[in-house]
């Protein structure tokens, strides 16, 4: 089961206040419902591939309106061939849609979210929970990027969801897709805040556990890469220094070098694996700092380059 499916399964087991049930059900019917007329009767089909969500919708309708509700199961014949669950409402459809602020008295659709549904903060959370159950998805935190989104067919409703989310300081953004619109989050901290808002506390803890391990692993990798780069740089510099010292020795001899440079050249040639700090501790006249050793080695490099260019180098 995917992380998103586990999150939704957890949400379908939450207990709610009566006002919150109405807010959640409104989002579920608005986003997953479709209307049909048969034998002069209006019916509502709410479709989902998640059995737990289908049971949730069925229970909320029965509890809230005491109506006859049918639960149908069909199998997709294409792609994954998953089961499709259809919750069918054939009684009081018009009244229920009006009560959930999905249609007006003249049966025109309400595209945004009615303020009467979300007057209380708990109801705001419940509407977002219903919206996530109906059209939401969240990446597994182990994947390369963090992403949570809620899909809506209508721009007005999508903008209303974005505004509702940002009322909780989530910094959500909207984007038009080929068949609708999404409100999305990209920041891990904001995704965990959203999971907390809608009541997915177990999913939140799992998300955070995985994120902490992942971030720690990334930090270790960055540190290792940095140390490896520094080590490669150090090795490269040491090899260059040794090559230059050999070139000077074979071309004009190390005796051409000033005493201080000759001593460092001989030490670097004889102790190729030691660090600059260790070289500084080997100098006969007393300990020299890394920067001091590095300065002398750069002078040796300069002399080697002059010799390669055909210049005459005299001992100073």
Swiss-Prot record:
| SS bonds (residue pairs) | none
Q: Which residues bind DNA?
A: 275-309
Instruction: Write the record's keywords in alphabetical order, separated by commas.
Output: Cell cycle, Cell division, DNA-binding
- What GO terms are given for molecular function? DNA binding
Q: Which InterPro entries match?
A: Homing_endonucl, Sporu_reg_WhiA_N_dom, Sporulation_regulator_WhiA, Sporulation_regulator_WhiA_C, WhiA_LAGLIDADG_dom
| Gene Ontology biological-process annotations | cell division; regulation of sporulation
Please describe what this protein does: Involved in cell division and chromosome segregation.
Family named by the database record: Belongs to the WhiA family.
Name of this protein:
Probable cell division protein WhiA
């Amino acid at each position: 089961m995917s992380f998103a499916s586990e999150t939704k399964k957890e949400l379908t087991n939450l207990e709610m206040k009566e006002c919150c049930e109405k807010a959640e059900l409104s989002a579920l019917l608005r986003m997953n419902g479709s209307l049909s007329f048969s034998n002069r009767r209006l019916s509502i089909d709410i479709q989902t591939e998640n059995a737990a969500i289908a049971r949730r919708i069925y229970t909320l309708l029965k509890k809230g309106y005491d109506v006859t509700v049918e639960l149908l199961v069909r199998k997709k014949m294409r792609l994954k061939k998953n089961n499709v669950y259809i919750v069918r409402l054939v009684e009081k459809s018009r009244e229920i849609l009006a009560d959930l602020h999905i249609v007006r008295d003249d049966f025109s659709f309400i595209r945004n979210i009615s303020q009467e549904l979300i007057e209380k903060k708990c109801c705001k959370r419940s509407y977002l929970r219903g919206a996530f159950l109906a059209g939401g998805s969240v990446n597994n935190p182990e994947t390369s990027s963090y992403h949570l989104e809620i899909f809506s067919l209508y721009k007005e409703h999508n903008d209303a969801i974005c505004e509702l989310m940002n009322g909780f300081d989530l910094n959500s953004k909207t984007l038009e897709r080929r068949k609708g619109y999404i409100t999305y989050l990209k920041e891990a901290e904001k995704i965990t805040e959203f999971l907390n808002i809608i009541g997915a506390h177990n999913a939140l803890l799992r998300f955070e556990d995985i994120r902490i391990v992942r971030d720690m692993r990334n930090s270790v990798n960055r540190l290792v890469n940095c140390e490896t780069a520094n080590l490669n740089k150090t090795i490269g510099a040491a090899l260059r220094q040794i090559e230059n010292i050999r070139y000077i020795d074979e071309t004009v001899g190390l005796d051409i070098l000033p005493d201080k440079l000759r001593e460092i050249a001989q030490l670097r040639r004889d102790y190729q694996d030691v660090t600059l700090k260790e070289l500084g501790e080997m100098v006969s006249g007393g300990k020299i700092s890394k920067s001091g050793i590095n300065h002398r080695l750069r002078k040796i490099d300069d002399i080697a380059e002059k010799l390669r260019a055909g210049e005459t180098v005299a001992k100073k």
